Structures are given as structure tokens and as C-alpha cells.
Amino acid sequence: MSLKLPRNWDFNLKAEASKIARSRSVMTGEQMAAFHPPTTPNPLERPIKVGWLKKQRSIVKNWQQRYFVLRAQQLYYYKDEEDSKPQGCMYLPGSTVKEIATNPEEAGKFVFEVIPASSDQNRIGQDSYVLMASSQVEMEEWVKFLRRVAGTPSGAVFGQRLDETVAYEQKFGPHLVPILVEKCAEFILEHGVSEEGIFRLPGQDNLVKQLRDAFDAGERPSFDRDTDVHTVASLLKLYLRDLPEPVVPWSQYEGFLLCGQLMNADEAKAQQELVKQLSTLPRDNYNLLSYICRFLHEIQLNCAVNKMSVDNLATVIGVNLIRSKVEDPAVIMRGTPQIQRVMTMMIRDHEVLFPKSKDAPISPPAQKNDAKKAPVPRSSVGWDATEDPPLSRTDSFSNTASSPDATSPTGPLPSDQHQEDSGKAPRENPGDWKMQSRKRTQTLPNRKCFLTSAFQGTTSSKLEIFKNEFWSPSSEAKAGEGHRRTMSQDLRHLSNDQRTSTYDNVPTSPQSQGNPAGALSPPASDSKRDALVSTDSEMEAGSKNSGEDDLDSLQRTVQSLQKEIETQKQVYEEQIKNLEKENYDVWAKVVRLNEELERERKKFAALEISLRNVERSREDVEKRNRVLEEEVKEFVKSMEKPKTKTDP
């Protein structure tokens, strides 16, 4: 048996799919949540923020009270706080959170909207959440947390990632830190160093909000002389608080807290650990932290007038630079003392922790063709960006000292020196930083110093004066700061002595007189090369000695800690024995008191029995008295009756 189907039947499912899509497009938020059941939240995952908000329905436009939970990257809402199954959820990364201005008739409504990231722009309005908070403060808190989880900038400046802000503002000129931070710091240094309670007293909230909106709108407002200094300080703190990730990244929060804990035991060790933590910061974060610490150091120099010492500034600013990812009051209270100590050290010792030699001024990208570079004026000093990976500090110093102009080849390197340089691996990954540190190029007079011919190199072997060992967790970075500083000073003295002898005492060869770029004789260069190689060996030996010194100091520290632990152990054992003895005495006393109490109870029971017996005896005596009274009355009556009979 065969089944015949009509010829006009259409098996195309596109029409049905379009009908389903149209029917879904007019669903309300609750219906969409039912159509796409929300993912079950992980109960073990700690919520970032919870609270009651009013949610506007999609079609009817009325408000419904819902309990919202911000957990991980999802925003859930429930009908009741006790419910375990959410009515809906939204995936926040890439979403947009914006505040909605209300009409004057709707005063008292604090409305904001969460728009999910979607390629279908026609359905954004259907999927967005329009929410209303009970107060302005609550709305700002929700907006801040939602924007932080969404990872999108809230505006041109506030709430934007630090690296994005710095990269964007390079079109206005080279800036190490955001323009907002520069303008606020310059204004405070000019008008606020003598202001009492700077950074501690709040500014005008409405003016702070106006300035924030102006910066977010792309404007660059300038502060006039009448602007309140406390308002500018509050604006700076607000910018630091609104960063999606703090200046000290969340991944290094525990490391900085550890530095604060080590300061109680060994401040030198804490400083070394802090140097390691600073070396792993992103370049933009390091520049901003360095700028702020130097700026705060200038503020505290006038602490006799403004009443803001290093400790006070560290307390009010540290929580804005170093904060936990989960803003739990218990976590904040636990980390506040350590943050205050670390911030105090960074402000007080900023010259050691943030040396100016580590500052890398930002310049426009270098031209690919070096021949097109503008010539540097004679007898002038400039800074040129290095493009190659940095080498060791000794290599970079020797090569830079040998050739003031790294781009001018004067001949091949000697074979032994070339092998020595090629055998040394770079200590730092060039990809770790967007911009390498800068080298100093110097144009000298016509007479070249003999250091010029000591080491010749090509364009591919550009070197820098100072190797950024500060940024790499190498063994030399573990040495004491004083040792490194002495090394660098000795090298600078050596370089100055060599340069002076070149200008004054070294005769030029005929080749150098005929050609300003010529080199001196090979014997002079060989002797100078030997001197520099010996300097390299001395520096390596110094680094080894410093490593041994660090090991010895570490061993001594461990031994002292072990002794301290043994002493504390003995003290604790003595205390435990004393407590056990006191506990036994108390227990014996309790037993004795219990026995006495039992005896008192028995005595009390016996007294009660005696009292009852006395009561019974008294009752018996009273009964006998009443009986005797009756008998006496009867006897008296019987005696009176015979007398009456005898009278007649």
C-alpha cells in the first residue's frame, strides 16, 4: 500500500522558525526567563552584592519588587529572598550600565538600566533591565559593581581601565599618568599643600559629580583659583576608587599584605619583598603608583600646617590604591593595618622604591628608517627609545660607554667580547612591557674619545645604559638596595673619569683628525676593553658576595626566629601548666563547695523536720489547753448549782 501526499505541501521550516522568533520577540522578561531557564547559581560562590530593587516590566511598564544577587558574572533576581530558584539572570560581561535621568515630576526615583551585549540591536530594549533603587547612594553602589563586573568603561575617564586611558590620552601628548591625575595633583600642590586636612576632609558632592560628568563627556575642565581644594582631592580619590581594577591588581593584593606583615619582624626584608612586588606591576600601574607616592611625599613635607603626616595620608589613600576584589567589611578590616604600613613605606622610601632612573618617558613610536631621524644638535643630550631586548646591566653600561651614538657603527666587535655578550641571556622578557626603557644618546665634539672604538656595534645591537633589572625577578634584584646604589655610583664615577681623560689627555690619530668619526689605535681600545671587562667581573663578584650576604642574613633571621619560637613555646607550656593547676584548684574548690552545700541541704532538711515536729507539738498543746479550759468551765458550773439549791 502506497501513501500519496498532496503536491502543494511545503516542507520548508523557515516560515515556522520566523513565527517562533516573532512570538519570542513580544515575550515579557518573565516569559523569556521561563523560555530560557536561568542557570542555577553556585551556592558555594560568594555573592558580590545583594539587595532589593524594583524592576520595570517590559510591556505594562509597572514596577515589581525583586531581590537581586550579583554573583560572579551573572545578575540573578528572585521573587523572595528565601527562594532558591531565580526568576531570571543576565550575563554581564560586555554589558552597558547607565543611569537614567528622571523628570522633575518623578523626583525621588533613582533609575538605571542594564543593557546586555548583543549583536541584534533590535532586541536590546527587550532584554535590558530597567531597575530603580531606593536612594542615590544605593544606585551608585549597584552601578559601580555592575560596571566592574561588566568590564566596560563607564565613560571617557571614570571607570575606564588604566591602560586604555593612558593609551587614549597619548594623542594629547606624552603622559605617564592620566591627565586627570596630573591636573588634580598640580592644582593641589599649588593651592592645597597648606590646607588643613587635605584628602581627609570631603569636598562638595555636587561639584565633584559635575566635574566627573565633564571628564566623562570628553571635556578637559580646568580648575580656577576659586575651586575648592577638597573637591579636587575628592575627585582624585573618586577616580582611583572607580578604576575597574585598582592600581595594585587583585592578583597582587595578598603579596602587598604580606609585605605589611613582614614589616613587624624585619623591615629590610619587607622592603626587598616590596621591591619584588613592584617589579611585577604593569608599567602603567607602576607609573601611576610612583607618581602618587612622590606627590604624597610633597604633601607631607608641609605636615606641620596641613596636619597630614605620612601615616595619615597612607590611611586615607591606601584603601583606594590597594583593595580586595570582594568588598567584605571583615576582609577590609583585616587588611587595613597592612595596607597602611605598606603605603607608609612607599611614601617615605619612594626615592629607593621608585628611583627616577626607572621612569621611562613616553615618546611617539620610533621611525622604522633610522636615516629619516632628525639629527641631534651638537653638544646636546637626548633620549632615544630602545627597540631591542635589554641586556645585563654591566653589558649595557660597557657598550653604551663605548659608543655614545649607538647607531653609528665603527667596526666589528672583538671576537672574545662578542662571544661573551652573545652568551649572556637577557634577564627580562621583552613582551612583558609595552615600552622598553630608554637609553641616553649624547653628541660629543669632533674629537672622539677612545671609548668610542672600544666596542663597535651595528644597528641591530642597540644597547641601553641601565638594564631594567628592577623589573625582573633575578638574583641580583634580591641584593640590598644600598649595594646596588653604590655600584651604580661607582660606575658613573668611572664613566665620568673616562670621559674627562678622553677630552683632555688623549691625542688623536691622523685618521681621527681627518675623519671626525674615526677611531683611535687598537692598543688604547684593548686596554680600555680590559678595564671594562674587569669592571664586569668585579660587579659579578659583588653580586655573588651580596647573594652570600643575603643568604647569611636569611639564615641568621631563621635562627633568631627559631629561638624566638622555642622561647614562646616554653612560655606557652608554663602558662598551660599554670592554667592546669589553677583549673585543678578550682575543680577541688567546686567539689568542696558541693559537699558543703549537700551538708547544708541535709541540715536544712533536718531543721524542717524539727520545725514540723514543733508545730505538731504546739498544736497538741493547744488542743490540750482547750480541753482543760472546757473541763474547768464544766467544773465551775457544777460548783455553782448546789449553792442555788441550798439558799431557800
From Swiss-Prot:
Q: Which stretches does the entry tag as region Disordered?
A: 356-559
The parts of the chain that form a coiled coil are 540-641
Point to the regions of Polar residues compositional bias: 393-410, 453-462, 497-515
An individual GO BP term: actin filament organization
Supply the InterPro entries for this chain. PH-like_dom_sf, PH_domain, Rho_GTPase_activation_prot, RhoGAP, RhoGAP_dom
Q: Does the keyword Phosphoprotein apply?
A: yes
Can you give the residue ranges of the Rho-GAP domain? 160-354
> What's the gene?
Arhgap25
SMART domains in the record? PH (SM00233), RhoGAP (SM00324)
Q: Which GO terms describe its molecular function?
A: GTPase activator activity
Q: What does this protein do?
A: GTPase activator for the Rho-type GTPases by converting them to an inactive GDP-bound state.
The protein's UniProt keywords, in alphabetical order, are: Coiled coil, GTPase activation, Phosphoprotein
- A Pfam short name: RhoGAP
Q: Write down which residues bear the modification named Phosphothreonine.
A: T407
Site keyed Arginine finger: positions: R200
Q: Where is the PH domain?
A: 46-151
Task: Indicate where the modification Phosphoserine is found in the sequence.
Answer: S363, S396, S403, S537
Under which name does UniProt file this protein? Rho GTPase-activating protein 25
What is one cellular component GO term in this UniProt entry? phagocytic cup
Q: Which PANTHER family match?
A: RHO GTPASE-ACTIVATING PROTEIN 25, SPERMATHECAL PHYSIOLOGY VARIANT
Q: Where is the composition biased (Basic and acidic residues)?
A: 417-431
